[in-house]
Design a protein with these regions (language model features):
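A cross-family signal for N-terminal binding/gating loops and helix N-caps
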Residues: 2-244
Length: 244
């Protein structure tokens, strides 16, 4: 039986990677993250009005996995684009999110899967919901036209491709005077994903500069693809997964 929470709790990336190196290691990580993404893309957020049968289901259809390990031992996996992590200068450590906290930020909403005993050895793992579809067939009350969402939905076969619109899909369905809840529900069946995963949108490569600070690699430096906004070198990790 599928259960995203258990999958995350038992996930041990390094145990599965073992002695793999280079491309083999990268491919193994993609395979592991694909399983997590498939669990997420098979489930949905249930937004339910209090004391009512009125509800909306919000199904993620595209997610990006983010994974950053704190600390400086050699084999740590670094993903410096992660928002919720300790400062590089060591001046501010961020406490751990309990499993399943929704983290709202300028790019959208992350479902967070953090682990560890303290901020210094934390694993900062999350999934950014990049695209989603809304099933409001059971929304019996509080209906109103979510204009911008409707426009987006109709353009892409019911799929909303703007990640920040998830705020509205989750938080603007029902009145706070009645109250509502948001709960994750695992899918009954696994959905099929696109064969190939993709790179994450506008995620740059990082390097350490001469002062040993972590900085983004500019598009003008070296060869390779630039990010969609043309400012930086694109990070090549294919951690973006989509429903077929």
């Amino acid at each position: 039986n599928m259960n995203l929470k258990e999958e995350i709790k038992t996930l041990d990336l390094h145990a599965q990677i073992g002695d793999l190196k280079g491309v083999d290691k990268e491919n193994k990580i993609v395979e592991i993250f694909r399983n997590v993404a498939q669990q997420i893309l098979s489930g949905y957020f249930l937004v339910q009005k209090n004391q009512s049968d009125s509800c909306v289901k919000v199904h993620p259809t595209c997610v990006e996995i983010y994974y950053h390990e704190e600390g400086d031992r050699g084999d740590k996996i670094k993903d410096y684009i992660v928002y919720h992590r300790n400062n590089d200068d060591g001046k501010m450590d961020k406490s751990l999110f309990p499993l399943g906290i929704l983290h709202n930020h300028v790019s959208g909403i992350d479902m967070t899967f953090e682990k560890g005993d303290n901020p210094q050895d934390a694993i900062r793992m999350s999934a950014l919901i990049r695209e989603f579809r809304m099933d409001d067939s059971k929304k019996l009350e509080d209906n109103y036209c979510m204009d911008y969402l409707e426009l987006k939905r109709n353009r892409r076969g019911n799929i909303v491709t703007k990640p920040t619109y998830l705020y509205d899909a989750l938080y603007s369905q029902f009145s706070v005077f009645d109250g509502f809840s948001i709960q994750w529900v695992d899918g009954e069946n696994l959905v099929e994903l696109e064969e190939e995963s993709e790179v994450r949108v506008n995620v740059p490569q990082f390097k350490r500069d001469e002062r040993n600070m972590v900085v983004k690699v500019l598009a003008s430096e070296g060869d390779g693809d630039a990010t969609a906004n043309k400012m930086y070198r694109q990070c090549l990790r294919k951690w973006n997964f989509k429903v077929k």
